[in-house]
Amino acid sequence: MNDITKLMVRTAYDALDEKLGQDIEIIDIQNISVISDYLILASGNNMNQISAMVDLTNEKMAEAGFRSRRIEGNKNSTWILMDYGDVVIHVFSKEDRAFYDLERIWRDGVTMTRDDF
């Protein structure tokens, strides 16, 4: 993991945390996927909170010099994906997160903490 990727993970995690994102989880998938190196998953209580989490994350990532390759979902979505290349961020409603259960799908990845970065 290089310093740029570490900064990306820290920046995204901190922005999600600042907007009171719940159950923020970092999964290292670099040994099992060519899609990305890390997934960051977070839950929000409602669409307003999800939107605020996404907006602040994009703002903080841009301030750090990172631009998203793609954003899937919109202000009315209960699952928004932000693709930053090495880091892909998923912000869900609690219900969508439980339903899609990405933690199970990526269970061969390594769960990490903010302190690892």
Which residues fall in each region the model found?
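Catalytic metal-binding acidic patch
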Residues: 37-39
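Short hydrophobic/aromatic beta-strand micro-patches
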Residues: 41-43
